[in-house]
Amino acid sequence: SGVNVLAPTWYSVTDSSGKMSCYASAGLVNKMHQRGTDVWALVSDFDTNVDFAALYSSKKARTNMVNTLINDAEKYGFDGINLDCENIKSAYAKDYLQFVRELSIACERKGLVLSTDNYKPEAYNRCYNLKEQSRFVDYVIVMAYDEHYAGTDAGSVASLPFVKEAVEDTVQLVGKEHVIAGIPFYTRIWSLTPKDTDNVSQTDTSDSSNYTTSSSVYGM
């Protein structure tokens, strides 16, 4: 009953010309509207075969994406657009920001909400430039999770100190009225496997270097 926005993953960039796969559903939008829930169409950049540097540096490609999203908003009736672009590199980050600017202008003209998903602010992702983003988007969503993930030591997905720091660091760059804290609806079950399986009984259990750490994701 507390959910007021649904953001389904409906679009995924498929090539550097700005083409996107689309799974939008007017039926779902209508059903959510009947419940008083807005729908923001989520756009992802998870296809590693796409040349994102070429995509964002091309005015034509950016325009293709903007036009597709704006036209589809009218076609399917969704209320906003959420950019879940998690693979932005510093080499073309300025071009991505230009895409955000251009999309924001089109969204404002059509009365659409625009939001972006971002990592917890760190030195390595500074190129996302949250302060600049906040000048053009309605909401900056901080992904306050993945504190530990596959390949790291075992630990919490989103401990309270981690989440608190993520929000506080984001608010230093973005007005708090424009910040949404993203929380995980999943956890990880961690497993330790002895590296020396022939002498398990002699393995020093106090030394984690004797084990291989792995994890599985479980959603709620």
Enumerate the language-model features and the residues they cover:
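Hydrophobic faces of well-ordered beta-strands that scaffold small-molecule active sites
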Residues: 4-8, 37-43, 81-83, 114-116, ...
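Glycan-recognition patch characteristic of GH18 chitinases/ENGases
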Residues: 1-68
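The substrate-binding groove and active-site-proximal loops of carbohydrate-active enzymes
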Residues: 14-17, 53-59, 86-93, 152-157
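Substrate-binding surface in catalytic domains of secreted glycosidases
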Residues: 15, 93-220
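Active-site groove signature of glycoside hydrolases
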Residues: 10, 66-95, 139-153
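Solvent-exposed coil/turn segments that connect beta secondary-structure elements
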Residues: 11, 37, 44-46, 86-88, ...
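Short, acidic/polar
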Residues: 1, 57-75, 122-133
